[in-house]
From Swiss-Prot:
This is Large ribosomal subunit protein bL35. Signal peptide: none annotated. Belongs to the bacterial ribosomal protein bL35 family. GO terms for cellular component: cytosolic large ribosomal subunit. InterPro entries: Ribosomal_bL35, Ribosomal_bL35-like, Ribosomal_bL35_CS, Ribosomal_bL35_sf. Pfam families: Ribosomal_L35p. It comes from Alcanivorax borkumensis (strain ATCC 700651 / DSM 11573 / NCIMB 13689 / SK2).
Amino acid sequence: MPKIKTNRGAAKRFKKTASGFKRKQAFKNHILTKKSSKTIRKLRPKQEVHENDVALVKRMMPYA
């Protein structure tokens, strides 16, 4: 039986950790001039994927 393909977009966006999957915070790529320094600072740290979405990410990354 052939191997299951990994979704390459998901592989670039998520990283497996011991407690789940790590992801980058959204809304921090461009159009940052109208956002305050406080808002940009709050968007800086990585976050965990929500428990409702973990099954979807696991399906996209079967070998993670």
